[in-house]
């Protein structure tokens, strides 16, 4: 039995003397290759052998952790890099970096970015580059943080050896954990917490900074989805670096910056001065889908290719009338479910369609699926917070319906991308909306694994292929007809008051912010002036169902308290009296609702402004409306709405009659609250085109 050399120089000499014995070992090869040692140059004695041997000596002497790792593997059979077999060469290069400087990982869609970050943390801890208690990772939503935890557990069952799950959280959770210790702030509001932490760190004394280090040492901070950073969050990261010497690790895809409405910017990721790594292999999609989505990238990053060499059909673009597209989708679904689970399919729609109805496009698809008895897993809600509230669990036998924003981080075998660029309400985008649309399209078209269909509605009034899709090389897709290419024009930017919530919060002093915290904790309703009145801030045209219900409940309580009859529901009364204008399709319905209902248009107003209306609007009005009935005195709807309403008309009528007789429920809102909610649902279902809710 040969003697075991001591670790250090004796081992280095031993290793080089016995290089032929160990060079064929897979684990040894993985170690050496990860640190840019050319294993082939060590297999035979030649002129490349000596330079390569010197590189090994330098590696072992400057990175003793690596030397000890190989030593323990050879003599004790302990390997700390077996997990690298799960990763690609690009990922291994990032994971095994021996420098502990600032880094940024630029990763394409489907490249395994989060897995690589987890692998990097494991390698750093197990090779002595960092302590597990000093590594933190933050993301921007509870869903993302939960998903991070899930992936750690699935990837490495021994995760407790290299990470503290409590250190991997949302940015607001981290802010709260610091502020509640040093300032006793306990707000749940993300924006307030972020601004408060940023302000605190900017003004913190040495004593306050030292008090933080007593319970939280942040040596390494990984920021996932860093393309979604805003100025406040980036300032926090820089403050950590300034006060605690924190090493910053940004990870993200600059082409997936889809939360610009939250003031996020990919410039923080792109321009951050750090050691750069790239992941260009896409392990999700076929090369055909990758080629298509690559053409939609807003930022010219390194071109990505398939990491699996999977091939499949080209992307198919369908440009037909809505009813034809719906029939094709239905046929595909019926054929698909014969051998596969529908939960592997997603239909992706723009978050806000194009126009005043928040989810016009979603509603059209939702109603179509429901009317054809297709089970739907609705991965979105009608409020503006759909990213936070969306559910991500798939339901067997249910097709997934979600927004462009809601697709982030998800993947499906087959994807239908609904392209409503101009077809729903024919409203031109602003220049900013047009550019954001490119980011959204890239995200939506990079979700598919095997098959992808782009669906564009055409009609007599519009229906053009999305401008960005026309930039895709035709060799990357099949199309059923020559697409209509519209002339690219933009509507004027809407000018808003700068008094947005975030802007207002940023202006507040530390004392005013604390006052807000105290107000939020109060459970009773009262009024207190802590800042100049800004109640004129536009809340937007969207109202969540709960918000509408609360408003109606407020009015009901007010009238009942004064022993008055409740205020009436104009829409419900029209339903009861069957005042319907039935149009052929959702497109016509949406156009007429916008120009008549939204503006409460009368025949007199129509005649006075006729020259200012679009020709397609005039044609529709003349096609469906009679001068015997006032324009704004009817419900504009499709047969889908009629079919559902007629089946429930008696219930709606009886519910409304009960509601209008407060003496019979003793002017007590508790006795009528369920009826009130049902009436609100009917009204809401019509407003958002989700008629199925009426059931």
From Swiss-Prot:
List the Gene Ontology MF annotations in alphabetical order.
3'-5' DNA helicase activity; ATP binding; ATP hydrolysis activity; DNA binding
Q: Which domain of life is it from?
A: Viruses
Read off the CDD domains from this record: DEXQc_UvrD (cd17932)
Q: One of this protein's GO BP terms?
A: recombinational repair
Pfam families for this protein: UvrD-helicase (PF00580), UvrD_C (PF13361)
Which InterPro entries does its entry note?
DNA_helicase_UvrD-like_C (IPR014017), DNA_helicase_UvrD/REP (IPR000212), P-loop_NTPase (IPR027417), UvrD-like_ATP-bd (IPR014016)
Instruction: Outline the extent of the UvrD-like helicase ATP-binding domain.
Output: 86-499
For ATP, which residues are the binding ones?
Answer: 107-114
Q: Which SUPFAM superfamilies match?
A: P-loop containing nucleoside triphosphate hydrolases
Q: Which UniProt keywords apply?
A: ATP-binding, Helicase, Hydrolase, Isomerase, Nucleotide-binding
Q: Note whether Hydrolase occurs among the keywords.
A: yes
Q: Which reaction does it catalyse?
A: Couples ATP hydrolysis with the unwinding of duplex DNA by translocating in the 3'-5' direction; ATP + H2O = ADP + phosphate + H(+)
| EC nos | 5.6.2.4
The family this protein is said to belong to: Belongs to the helicase family. UvrD subfamily.
Q: What does this protein do?
A: ATP-dependent DNA helicase.
Q: Kindly provide the name given to this protein in its UniProt entry.
A: Putative ATP-dependent DNA helicase R568
Give the species this sequence originates from: Acanthamoeba polyphaga mimivirus
